[in-house]
């Protein structure tokens, strides 16, 4: 029964992986082609491209971890290759979260309507410093990933082996305290960008409320371009927050799996839920971006035209 559930979850993970690769590769390809064509890239496109690349890597690492657990359990428990996988999973995990937070911050400074001198100063300079902010996210993610992965990997693999050797059970219980502290460190590290994103969300709501009130007083209506920009930004941010909560819970399941009787099943279940976040959020970003939405509709229209042409030719031959 457990093998059937594992196979079902593995097929689900492959489907989520395929959808996520399609959406994120589309974002990266469109922005890179536009970059080559114009020989420059906008700040928003740079953030979206960085986010898409990090999520493609994250999707590949999660799926690789799933296949290794199911097909090569001995390598998963003892192989040195898993240290590399765990490091890149932790790295791409933090990169994708921090890049999404940078997107929320960028929306806040570019769309928000505040008149505080510090806000206006940052609003004017955000395009100049965004590349340095992204680089800082990379450095911070590497700094977090190196020590945390080493400790978490050693504790987790040891307890996976303890599932098969009863004489190691007591030692595994001793290591649970160290494992819990490492896990707490990783979770707190991901909560920081979540709090920053949540703050940007509430400030955008406040900005939208002030803007609508100003439009009502001037009797110009509420559906102006600034209001539309606020709404699109809020949709992107709130979708990230909700998906991140689901991803955070799945991360807790995966990292706490050796407390459970079915360790392998718990890991695959957690990872299948984790794949929802990097897979689905890319399509929300596509729908919220005018350029990406236009290109996607254009591609869909061309594909439908080709399919209709083939059906017409087949019908004509019959």
UniProtKB/Swiss-Prot annotation:
* Keyword Transmembrane among UniProt keywords: yes
Q: Which GO terms describe its molecular function?
A: bitter taste receptor activity; G protein-coupled receptor activity
Lipid bilayer topology: Multi-pass membrane protein
Q: Which residues lie on this side of the membrane: Cytoplasmic?
A: 31-55, 116-128, 209-235, 288-318
Spans through the membrane: 10-30, 56-76, 95-115, 129-149, 188-208, 236-256, 267-287
Q: Pull the Extracellular topological domain ranges from the record.
A: 1-9, 77-94, 150-187, 257-266
Carbohydrate attachment sites? Answer: 167, 175
Q: Which UniProt keywords apply?
A: G-protein coupled receptor, Glycoprotein, Membrane, Receptor, Sensory transduction, Taste, Transducer, Transmembrane, Transmembrane helix
CDD domains according to UniProt = 7tm_TAS2R7-like
Location(s), subcellular: Membrane
Give a yes or no for keyword Cell division in this entry.
Answer: no
Q: Record's GO cellular component, any one? A: plasma membrane
Listed under GO biological process in this entry are: detection of chemical stimulus involved in sensory perception of bitter taste
Query: Organism's domain of life?
Result: Eukaryota
Remaining remarks: Several bitter taste receptors are expressed in a single taste receptor cell.
Read off the PANTHER family from this record.
TASTE RECEPTOR TYPE 2, TASTE RECEPTOR TYPE 2 MEMBER 7
Q: What does this protein do?
A: Gustducin-coupled receptor implicated in the perception of bitter compounds in the oral cavity and the gastrointestinal tract. Signals through PLCB2 and the calcium-regulated cation channel TRPM5.
Q: Which family does it belong to?
A: Belongs to the G-protein coupled receptor T2R family.
Protein's name according to its UniProt entry: Taste receptor type 2 member 7
Gene behind this protein: TAS2R7
